[in-house]
Curated annotation (Swiss-Prot):
This is Spore coat protein SP87. GO terms for cellular component: extracellular matrix; spore wall; transport vesicle. It comes from Dictyostelium discoideum. The gene is pspD. Residues 175-184 have a biased composition (Low complexity). Induction: By cAMP. InterPro entries: Dict_spore_N (IPR007643), Fol_N (IPR003645).
Length: 677
């Protein structure tokens, strides 16, 4: 039983640790990938492209050097990777890097065509080992004399006098040259036999044996339609060509427009037959062309991982299809070049056609073409949001006009509670449209300045928040008795709290009349926030004459009445140094402050080089002088045959000697005529 329990605990720990594991492939920030202890940054390079990076799971100890080639399943792009931990989604490992020479299989392939193999390096500035160049079959070998096709004089170039080049085939095999001008219907994968490890594909309408990237297929006699072989994922096209799947199988066709040899099946003349080629859709959209002439940006399917490396959400954005084909992405992640519909006039013969004329952008975007060839969908509409409509219905009390979800006007009940803020005189509490309480100036006229109700003892007449007269109890603690510092004075706010404010303040505006009724010795003021408060007048307040019990003192309250209030602080108990005295501040804290009386004089007679001081406890004592100034006795000038004099020092600072002793001679030969040594 204990064993089963331990297994269960271990299984739960395994599940928890697995749930908290880092998914390195989802990290799109290179710095975050470096910081993660479970992930490693791996660089990869496309053919003739700039280096990129990917975040993969692993460490520097486990992820060692291994040069490999991968193909992106979404756009058939081949990349070179130098780390064995590379596992980016959508990439399939295809081959190991090839040598910079013709392989034995390519030599056999060229021999079957009666040609010799020649390796041509890639012309870009940074070719990778995964696509260093291409092996091509060119010329006639020395032993091939069976060229059927009317060559004049048996020249090695295979050029016929009739103007067709390379039209001869030997033994029914695909003997057309690589120039792409074969006579239609001569070469076909159904009659082409490739060596082991190769399969047949149509390159420029010529049956060509290409290296298979999956083992076990491509036996002699298999065509491009054999199961497992007819796929762009297992086809390596020559440099400058792209793999296309159509109803006839797998074909390698030239990549890009403008190439000579109008082998396009669309019947177009000039321009770009693919309308989506120069259309830049916004993020979340991709270009589709279903009628062969109108490009339309449509929403991309929302899949979980349509872009694994933080690139463009539209897989067709980085795919260039050949003439007669256009890119489609139906599942949101796989870009595929499909034949364009054969329309009579997919592009006009004129060269000044507006690229935006056949582009439909999504809602909120419009087509823009700044370079004359690239159509781009950019956000449209005003730069500022439109003003909201005004609700104009007249609603009953406690209701307000609002727009419902359908945009219709209706009266709804206001659900907020009563406003609970306590506002100053002349203001009232309101709840705004966001439900927030605030004090606003009242629209009703202010109450009269004098409250005329006769109230009982220890009560006074006041106006409530609605302007009505009422008697309220007088509180004896409303005297502004804070001990404020110099330059400050005590004030009582409208809510009864006390505060110290700076005395030198700008006077309130003259049009704001202060309406608060203040006690004798006080006056009404409007502070910098527009609040009314009673402050001590600059004239002395009336003297308080009541005799109060111990720990109490006589005070004049806020309304001019005398009363005894309790003293809340005890006697100050701090022992302060001379010249200081103990005080209790407005917070009840004891502190030593400088006394306004002069400090006591020290009367002790002290020995030489000492002085009388009063210590921290008020006791007199003799201490050694801080500035022990030298005298002539200290120098012993007479023993040297010199005279001594006290010279004034031009420094007027505390603890500095006013004079210093100097030895001098009257003989100018000894001191250079200066008189001092």
């Amino acid at each position: 039983m204990l064993f089963l329990k331990n297994i269960g605990v271990f299984f739960m720990i395994f599940l928890v640790s697995k749930s908290y594991a880092t998914d390195c492939n989802k990290i799109t920030n290179e710095e975050e990938c470096h910081k993660s202890s479970e992930c490693i940054v791996i660089n990869y390079t496309p053919c003739c492209g700039e280096q990129k990076w990917a975040c993969s799971k692993g460490t520097f100890d486990t992820c060692t050097y291994e040069n490999s080639c991968y193909r992106n399943s979404s756009n058939n792009q081949v990349v070179e990777v130098s780390n064995k931990c590379f596992n980016l989604d959508g990439f399939i490992k295809i081959t190991t890097p090839t040598e910079y020479s013709c392989s034995d299989a390519k030599i056999k392939e060229c021999a079957l065509l009666g040609k010799s193999c020649s390796f041509q390096k890639n012309s870009c500035s940074n070719p990778t080992s995964c696509c260093p160049g291409e092996s091509i079959c060119e010329g006639l070998s020395s032993g091939s004399s069976t060229s059927g096709g009317g060559s004049s004089g048996g020249t090695s170039g295979g050029s016929s006098s009739g103007g067709t080049s390379g039209g001869s085939s030997s033994g029914g095999t695909s003997g057309s040259s690589s120039s792409g001008s074969s006579s239609g219907g001569v070469s076909s994968c159904s009659t082409t036999h490739c060596p082991e490890g190769y399969h047949c594909s149509m390159v420029n309408d010529v049956a060509t044996c290409l290296a298979s990237t999956t083992g076990g297929t491509g036996l002699p006699g298999t065509s491009s339609s054999t199961a497992g072989v007819s796929s762009c994922l297992t086809t390596l096209c020559p440099i400058g060509h792209i793999c296309v799947e159509d109803s006839n199988g797998v074909n390698c066709v030239p990549n890009g427009g403008g190439t000579s040899g109008g082998s396009s099946s669309t019947g177009t003349s000039g321009g770009h037959p693919d309308p989506c080629r120069d259309v830049d859709c916004p993020d979340g959209f991709h270009c589709e062309c279903k009628d062969g002439k109108t490009a339309k940006c449509v929403p991309s399917p929302t899949t979980g991982s349509s872009s694994t490396s933080g690139g463009h959400p539209d897989p067709c954005k980085d795919v260039t299809c050949p003439d007669g084909f256009h890119c489609e992405c139906k599942d949101g992640k796989t870009a595929k070049c499909v034949p364009s519909p054969t329309t009579g006039s997919s592009s006009t013969s004129g060269g000044n056609t507006n690229p935006c004329s056949n582009v439909n952008c999504p809602d909120g975007f419009y087509c823009e073409c700044k370079d004359g060839k690239t159509a781009k969908c950019v956000p449209s509409g005003p730069t500022q949001p439109p003003k909201p409509p005004v609700c104009s219905l007249r609603c009953p009390p406690n209701h307000e006009c609002r727009f419902n979800d359908q945009g219709h006007q209706c009266c709804v009940k206001v659900h907020h509670d009563r406003c609970s803020l306590r506002c100053p005189h002349g203001h009232e509490c309101k709840v705004d449209h966001n439900g927030k309480e605030c004090c606003v100036r009242s629209h009703r006229p202010p109450p009269p300045e004098v409250c005329s109700l006769r109230c009982p003892p220890k009560h006074e007449c006041k106006f409530d928040d609605h302007g009505k007269k009422c008697c309220v109890k007088i509180h004896c603690d409303e005297v502004c008795d804070l001990d404020c510092g110099r330059g400050f004075e005590c004030k009582i706010r409208h809510d009864g709290s006390k505060c110290c404010v700076r005395s030198e303040r700008p006077h309130p505006p003259q049009h704001e009349k202060c309406n608060k009724r203040c006690p004798p010795g006080h006056e009404c003021k409007v502070d910098q926030h527009g609040k009314e408060c009673c402050v001590v007048a600059h004239r002395p307040p009336p003297k308080c004459s009541l005799r109060c019990p111990p720990r109490h003192e006589c005070r004049v309250n806020h309304f001019g009445e005398e009363c005894c209030v309790k003293v809340h602080h005890d006697k100050c108990s701090l022992r302060c140094p001379p010249g200081h005295e103990c005080k209790v501040d407005q917070h009840g804290k004891e502190c030593c402050v400088v006394a306004h009386r002069p400090p006591p004089k020290c009367s002790l007679r002290c020995p030489p080089k000492h002085e009388c001081r009063i210590n921290h406890f008020g006791e007199e004592c003799c201490v050694k002088s801080r500035n022990d100034c030298l005298t002539c006795e200290d120098l012993n000038c007479e023993r040297k045959g010199l005279h001594c004099a006290m010279k004034t020092v031009p420094i007027d600072k505390e603890n500095c000697c006013e004079k210093v002793p100097v030895c001098y001679s009257t003989n100018p030969l000894l001191d250079g005529g200066h008189g001092f040594i």
